[in-house]
């Protein structure tokens, strides 16, 4: 072999008799020794609907790999459900879990000297955590997500989790209606059905190049999702041999996830109005890959990439299943490439360049590829279902309408400015992020008095208690990576603002972050954060906050001298922080660096 198998340290030589005995006890056949050992990194848990259907698939992937002569071994990572952890101190653990996942994958794979990986991820911190590990390890890797949930339905309208949250806090909605919405919003397994963080990351993985076509959009319940796992099993064996036998390093994560690939992924995110959390995660993944990709790159892209796709929560018309029907991520990338907005010579895990992939999977050409038609015809089963790949409904026709359909061409873009913007100013000298795709253009310029809260809990009480009125800017401080610690998502405050019918009349700014389900004038990731001495921690009630999205600025109306002389506002909250999170806070950076741990 041109590259020595990592596993040879435990399978070769007389002195490794004990290790070989243990491999045999694990089910390895003698003829498998000396061949690649492939780790199956699963994230099954019954705490998270995005992962509850992954129990058996790891063993099915193992069986497919072993048919091809290699030994495969499965292990699990933790997985936190942000929706269940939200609204209480459980959310403090969500972002730190990303690093725990990355560490645990590195520990397991390096300790046992696995040669390659299939990563079975799905929800918010699991996909980025595994991607961070893949960049550290840099061994042949294929990602397959568990897939998106079908959209719910009630009163002939599509629903999702965010609808349940908003309606439950709206006094004009009856208890009976809330109960029915609650029962129908999440009809089974998969990650929540809009362009929230989980789906955003699984879609971006297709642009990064480590996810197969359909990774981000084929429904969890569809048979074609199961086929994707089979394809991944065959591909990882092929790529393992390409690297170790042939010395072909083009299959390695760092060869695929180059600077150009990160630029492509961010371009996609802006074009589809993805979650602002993707900014945090892409910065962290690039950090692990030792790729020079920073907030300034995101700012540059946001100024000229148009919005070509709007999905819930940015509209109620479309959910992820509709993106799939319109040709999925490769067809959004195809439209972007027509405008010269992508680097199409980048490599992909399937061996294609991006240019070759967007051509092969283009559903708008006269002769549609058979595989493309199979993938993008995958339709919802429209009934409650928690079993992976258990239905095979198909759309009668694909959505190829690029003027008025789910995916638009450049000439019919939703807006010439994309779905994300980076703002800077005296509140956020190192930047902050807003999902413009979810902001009504009438409030892209907004000015109002600050209503300051030093915790998410206090903000929720203030909003529900009527302390926030039309024209206010809600300011939530000390919720950044260090200050939280853990950088909580602010979905409940933004949902409560909507439930009070103030969605177009108020803004919210924070050094915390937002759920992918957030829309409205919600500005997060303010850096430096309050706990790192950032000026957001100096704002007091009544200060005038000026937000100007077109000019990419955010400022408090104070002179530099006034701001420099003003002390940090006192923190009045009573929050008990466990040692595990204190350790995290002692190492973590602000959001403009991806919230990564800074370790000398």
Curated annotation (Swiss-Prot):
[2Fe-2S] cluster binds at residues 123, 192. Disulfide bonds: none annotated. This is Dihydroxy-acid dehydratase. Belongs to the IlvD/Edd family. Its cofactor is [2Fe-2S] cluster; Mg(2+). It comes from Phocaeicola vulgatus (strain ATCC 8482 / DSM 1447 / JCM 5826 / CCUG 4940 / NBRC 14291 / NCTC 11154) (Bacteroides vulgatus). It catalyses: (2R)-2,3-dihydroxy-3-methylbutanoate = 3-methyl-2-oxobutanoate + H2O; (2R,3R)-2,3-dihydroxy-3-methylpentanoate = (S)-3-methyl-2-oxopentanoate + H2O. The modification N6-carboxylysine is found at residue 125.
């Amino acid at each position: 072999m041109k590259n020595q198998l990592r596993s040879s340290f435990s399978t070769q030589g007389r002195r490794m008799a004990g290790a070989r005995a243990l491999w045999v006890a694990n089910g390895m056949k003698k003829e498998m020794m000396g061949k690649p050992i492939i780790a199956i990194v699963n994230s099954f848990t019954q705490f998270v609907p995005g992962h509850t259907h992954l129990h058996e698939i790891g063993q099915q992937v193992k069986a497919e790999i072993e048919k091809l002569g290699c030994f495969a071994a499965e292990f699990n990572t933790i997985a936190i459900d942000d929706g269940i952890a939200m609204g209480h101190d459980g959310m403090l653990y969500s972002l730190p879990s990303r690093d725990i996942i990355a560490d645990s994958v590195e520990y397991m794979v390096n300790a046992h000297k696995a040669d390659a990986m299939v990563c079975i991820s799905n929800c918010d911190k699991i996909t980025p955590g595994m991607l961070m590990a893949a960049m550290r390890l840099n061994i042949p890797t294929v990602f397959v997500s568990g897939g998106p949930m079908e959209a719910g339905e009630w009163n002939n309208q599509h629903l999702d989790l965010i609808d349940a949250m908003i309606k439950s806090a709206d006094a004009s909605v009856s208890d009976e209606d809330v109960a029915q919405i609650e029962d129908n919003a999440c009809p089974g397994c998969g990650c929540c059905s809009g362009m929230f963080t989980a789906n955003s990351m699984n879609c971006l993985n297709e642009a990064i190049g480590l996810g197969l076509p359909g990774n981000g959009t084929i429904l969890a319940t569809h048979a074609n999702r199961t086929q994707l796992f089979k394809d991944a099993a065959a591909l990882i064996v092929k790529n393992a041999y390409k690297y170790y036998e042939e010395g072909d390093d083009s299959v390695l994560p760092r060869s695929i996830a180059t600077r150009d690939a990160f630029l492509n992924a961010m371009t996609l995110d802006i074009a589809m109005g993805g979650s602002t959390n993707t900014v945090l995660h892409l910065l962290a993944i690039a950090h692990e890959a030792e790729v020079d990709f920073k907030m300034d790159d995101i700012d540059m892209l946001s100024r000229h990439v148009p919005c070509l796709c709007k999905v819930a929560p940015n509209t109620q018309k479309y959910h992820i299943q509709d993106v799939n029907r319109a040709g999925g991520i490769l067809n959004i990338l195809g439209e972007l490439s027509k405008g010269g907005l992508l680097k199409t010579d980048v490599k992909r895990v399937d061996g294609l360049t991006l240019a070759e992939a967007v051509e092969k999977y283009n559903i708008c050409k006269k002769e549609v590829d058979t595989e493309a038609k199979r993938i993008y015809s995958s339709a919802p089963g429209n009934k409650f279902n928690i079993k992976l790949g258990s239905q095979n409904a198909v759309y009668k026709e694909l959505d190829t309408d690029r003027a008025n359909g789910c995916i638009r061409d450049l000439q019919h873009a939703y807006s010439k400015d994309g779905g994300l913007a980076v703002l800077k100013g005296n509140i956020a000298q190192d930047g902050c992020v807003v999902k413009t795709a979810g902001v009504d253009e009438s409030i892209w310029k907004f000015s109002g008095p600050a209503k300051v809260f030093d915790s998410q809990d206090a903000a929720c009480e203030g909003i529900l208690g009527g302390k926030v009125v039309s024209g206010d800017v809600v300011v939530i401080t000390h919720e950044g990576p260090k200050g939280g610690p853990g950088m909580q998502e602010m979905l409940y405050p933004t949902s409560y603002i909507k439930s009070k019918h103030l969605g177009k009349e108020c803004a919210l700014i924070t050094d915390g972050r937002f759920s992918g389900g957030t829309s409205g004038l919600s500005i997060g990731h303010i850096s430096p954060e309050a706990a790192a001495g950032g000026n957001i921690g100096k704002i007091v009630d009544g200060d005038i906050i000026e937000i100007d999205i077109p000019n990419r600025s955010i400022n408090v109306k104070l002179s530099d001298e006034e701001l420099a002389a003003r002390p940090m506002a006192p923190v009045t909250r009573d929050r008990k922080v466990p040692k595990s999170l204190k350790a995290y806070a002692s190492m973590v950076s602000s959001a403009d660096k991806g919230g990564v741990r800074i370790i000398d």
